[in-house]
Amino acid sequence: MYLLIVKKTDRLEGIVKAPPSKSYTHRAVIGASLADGVSRIINPLWGADCLSSVHGCRMLGANIELDKEKDEWIVKGGELKTPDNIIDIGNSGTTLRILTSIASQIPKGYAILTGDDSIRKRPMQPLLDALKQLNIEAFSSKLDGTAPIIVKSGKIYGNVVKIRGDISSQFITSLMMLLPFNKEDTEIILTSPLKSKPYIDITLDILNKFGIKIDKTDNGFLVYGNQKYKPIDYIVEGDYSSASYLIAAGVLINSNITIENLFANSKQGDKAIINIVKEMGADIKVKKDKVIIEGEYSLKGIDVDVKDIPDLVPTIAVLGCFAEGKTEIYNGEHVRLKECDRLRACAVELKKMGADIEEKPDGLIIRGVKKLKGAKLNTYHDHRLVMAFTIAGLKAEGETIIEGEEAVKISFPNFVDVMKSLGANIEVK
């Protein structure tokens, strides 16, 4: 396991590019694998999770060429096949959930999907129950609603599927990507309020690019039947979740940084980081395709509803530590179901640095202390915690040692190099 050694940094300066969007890359490569013909995914995220989707799609029959030099993936899709081995999707929950549904459309036999320790704890039962309503046989090998998942080849029957909206939006994305294969139109009815709605907006956006028509209804969505995915050339935009660490660093530290490849009209929910730091008092400049930050700024605590932005929780928690007054994060029960229990992890680890932070069932209360001290932190193999805690370490007195640096390969493989290029005092050991 690698350690990240982070020391207090007085100045950040430079122009950097936000890494490509993880959410868009996943959906683009899976959609392209379902399209009959050749698609090009341009500027994809070369992160471990998205490469898990590449691996899973290859196992299900797609021919995918990865061209590092041109920074594009060429995908020849359209013909699903029965995999000749178990599909190991590593640490990618998105891959597991979307491909569980897609695997039902193989021509014969079974597909088995599994992953690492963290993945084998993630809830899958709501999706398995939904698939059962559509005559699809998919079950947990342990019969406890978690991976390994065994999926039987089968035709979709039925025109209504009911599913909860408050556990994971990935279940709904999975159904949306499957149901164009149904011969008839299908209504997805949400039986509880939808959380992480912006991720569904991303799914709708990319499915529309592939020629798939889905309408919103009063209580869910209507997916039209007998549709075909069309091959496309698709350029992946920058990722606001990953950029949130760069934005937080610029806001907290004396800085002059420009983050390119961030589009003001993006459908990503995590674009909310812009309004969050502005509301806290950071006068950052937002252009059509970039963000300019001239920090540092005096921040004040605010209340943040994280129902739709679970991935921003670690970033907001760190910002709250350095803000005047109280920052409250609420509506985040689902944040406990990520790579780790992120609410607990933020509370436990930031306390080691001297933070005044209190855990609640659905969030965190942080009282700004303005100063943190270096400490040795555990990140529970969670990429977002590695990056958020790095930003805390850049502002803290002394040296912060962060375990599990390699986790950043999931969403922001060159995070350390990008931070160093801005002048961050960090090294990997």
UniProtKB/Swiss-Prot annotation:
Catalytic reaction(s) noted: 3-phosphoshikimate + phosphoenolpyruvate = 5-O-(1-carboxyvinyl)-3-phosphoshikimate + phosphate
GO molecular function (one): 3-phosphoshikimate 1-carboxyvinyltransferase activity
Keyword Transferase among UniProt keywords: yes
Binding residues for phosphoenolpyruvate: 22, 93, 122, 170, 342, 384
Subcellular location per the Swiss-Prot or TrEMBL entry: Cytoplasm
Class of this enzyme: transferase
Keyword flag Transcription: no
Pathway the protein takes part in: Metabolic intermediate biosynthesis; chorismate biosynthesis
Keyword annotations from UniProtKB, A to Z: Amino-acid biosynthesis, Aromatic amino acid biosynthesis, Cytoplasm, Transferase
EC number: 2.5.1.19
Single Gene Ontology BP annotation: amino acid biosynthetic process
Amino-acid positions noted as binding 3-phosphoshikimate in the UniProt annotation, renumbered to this chain: 22-23, 27, 168-170, 196, 311, 338
One cellular component term from this protein's GO annotations in UniProt: cytoplasm
Active site: 311
Family classification: Belongs to the EPSP synthase family.
Assembly with partners or alone: Monomer.
Known function: Catalyzes the transfer of the enolpyruvyl moiety of phosphoenolpyruvate (PEP) to the 5-hydroxyl of shikimate-3-phosphate (S3P) to produce enolpyruvyl shikimate-3-phosphate and inorganic phosphate.
Protein name: 3-phosphoshikimate 1-carboxyvinyltransferase
Lineage, top ranks: Archaea, Methanobacteriati, Methanobacteriota, Methanomada group, Methanococci
